[in-house]
Design a protein with these regions (language model features):
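Short substrate-entry loop that stabilizes the transition state in hydrolases
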Residues: 39, 53-56, 60-68, 73-110, ...
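Alpha/beta-hydrolase active-site loop
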Residues: 90, 116-146, 161-162, 167, ...
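Short beta-strand/loop motif that positions the catalytic acidic residue
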Residues: 244, 250-252
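Domain-level recognition of soluble alpha/beta enzyme cores
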Residues: 1-72, 93
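Conserved alpha/beta-hydrolase "acid-adjacent" motif
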Residues: 234-236, 257-263
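Catalytic active-site module of serine/aspartate enzymes centered on a nucleophile-bearing elbow/loop
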Residues: 284-331
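Gly/Ala-rich beta-loop-alpha elbow adjacent to hydrolase catalytic centers
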Residues: 152-156, 160
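Short beta-strand immediately N-terminal to the catalytic nucleophile in serine-hydrolase-like folds
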Residues: 150-152, 251
């Protein structure tokens, strides 16, 4: 199995501002890629909630005569790029370049912002802008395919579907949404809905809020993997889902109480004609799709890492095998 290289960097989307209005929107990225055969992988040394695989930091990429396939990864609500490192690492072992971003204001890598949690559509533009960016391409020094696959977990699944043509009818927490959310915010921001009235007086938020029904489809994204899509997908315009023709693989867990599969995954599958659905059995919860924990992670947030009677690694192995086969079949 080929060594996996890993690099990180910071791009900017100069077409959009950060939430403070003090500069361009940041796109902090992480990339897993097939490294050359001589690359030396070393275990991570920095403390983390997540178990991390050994990688070859900034190693030369394994060059081939063909352009390399790219998979863009989108983390869940309040998460980080490394939250999909388990998938990125396995994709790289199979020859893919897996590029993930920390979604500004909606990531644990920086202070949470209610704007970031409310304006989920900005996440789609993050991936489009990052795919355009030159710095990660120059850092890796290879030729890449001019189209990409996209995979996302939870809010990341919402992001993936926006790029494939889903359009917003209602934000999950907007007052006019006829489908009332059973919660007022996610685990990371439980009073999120209460921030909307005051934020509507903020120019930067209002500009983004008024973009929510725009079309974020990017024709360069040719397939999508939606892992445990959250309740936010129920705010998509149904006719836009019916018009998606790109292949979509939906994966959920039978014991997901955050985004119940029968409520979210099954609903999407019925609306997206080009989709396939797999609901994993055996007590698979929402957070099973996050990385395996370290002792530090278990101590800090046991509810995220509790898996009753299952091996999280085996679930990740299965999802990664499904993803690799799916993306290879759609190239």
């Amino acid at each position: 199995m080929m060594p996996v290289g890993f690099s990180q960097g910071l791009s900017f989307d100069r077409k959009r501002t950060n939430w403070n209005g003090t500069g361009p929107r940041p796109l902090a990225w992480s990339v897993w890629y097939p490294a050359n055969d001589e690359a030396i992988e070393t275990p991570p040394s920095a403390p983390s909630w997540f178990k991390q695989e050994a990688v070859a930091h900034d190693a030369p990429i394994k060059l081939t005569s063909d352009a390399l396939p790219v998979v863009m990864l989108s983390h869940g609500s309040g998460g980080v790029a490394g939250g999909l490192g388990w998938l990125g690492h396995r994709l790289a072992q199979s020859g893919f370049v897996a590029l993930a971003v920390n979604h500004h204001g909606h990531t644990g890598s920086e202070p949470y912002r209610p704007e970031g949690f409310l304006c989920l559509w900005e996440r789609a533009s993050d991936l489009s802008a990052l795919f355009d960016a030159d710095d990660w391409k120059e850092a890796l020094g290879a030729t890449f395919e001019n189209h990409a696959h996209v995979a996302g977990f939870s809010a990341g699944a919402y992001t993936a579907l926006l790029l494939l043509g889903a359009r917003v009818a209602y934000s999950q927490f907007e007052p006019d949404n006829p489908r009332k959310s059973p919660v007022r915010g996610p685990r990371e921001f439980p009073d999120l809905a209460e921030h909307i009235p005051s934020l509507l007086h903020d120019r930067i938020f209002l500009e983004s809020w008024n973009r929510r029904r725009e079309n974020f489809k990017d024709e360069r994204f040719v397939t999508g993997l939606a892992i445990a899509p959250g309740r936010s997908v129920l705010g998509f315009a149904e006719d836009s889902l019916e018009q998606i023709n790109a292949p979509v693989q939906i994966i959920g867990g039978d014991a997901d109480t955050i985004a119940p599969a029968n409520e979210c995954c099954v609903w999407l599958h019925k609306k997206i004609r080009s989709s396939s659905l797999e609901i994993l059995q055996g007590g698979i919860g929402h957070y099973t799709f996050l990385p395996e924990p370290t002792s530090q992670g278990i101590k800090a947030s046991p509810e995220i890492f509790y898996d009753s009677g299952l091996q999280r690694k085996s679930v990740h192995d299965h999802v990664a095998r499904t993803a690799i086969a799916f993306f290879k079949a759609c190239r």
